[in-house]
Amino acid sequence: MVLTMVSMNSANLIDRLTIAGASAQAFDQVWRAIWNQPHVPAAILELCRLNLARLHRAEAELAMRMPLAQSLDEEKIQSLLRENWMTDPRFSASERAVLNFTEWYHVDPQSIPDQVANEVIAHLGQSGFVALIEALGFIDGRIRIAMIYSRIQE
């Protein structure tokens, strides 16, 4: 058996999951719904996805851009990946609040301080906050699964 590195990422993960049939289809429908919901803009979710990918060191994930977030400037993305989002004036207060929350989420979702959560609520509202938490869980899970599939023997 030969070990091959497959460039799996959260977007093309469905290619590997189709064997699960209806469950895979439902999983993919949720993925698409997250990017199309009205509470957190796709561009902000893309910043979160890239930040989680950076934190996981998920190279295939970092190389990919979500089509629904095409409005994001590549220089802004590179600033995020260099960890300059806290001081770069291209990032709005809303984006900073969400990215800060994302980093706390990555470390331990249960340890997120109320102040960090309240900053997100101040910018996105309660519905946006709930949508963000659900999206982060799903995005993080898909990144992790894609990383596993990238290392599976063919």
Feature locations, PLM:
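Hydrophobic alpha-helical segments
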Residues: 1-154
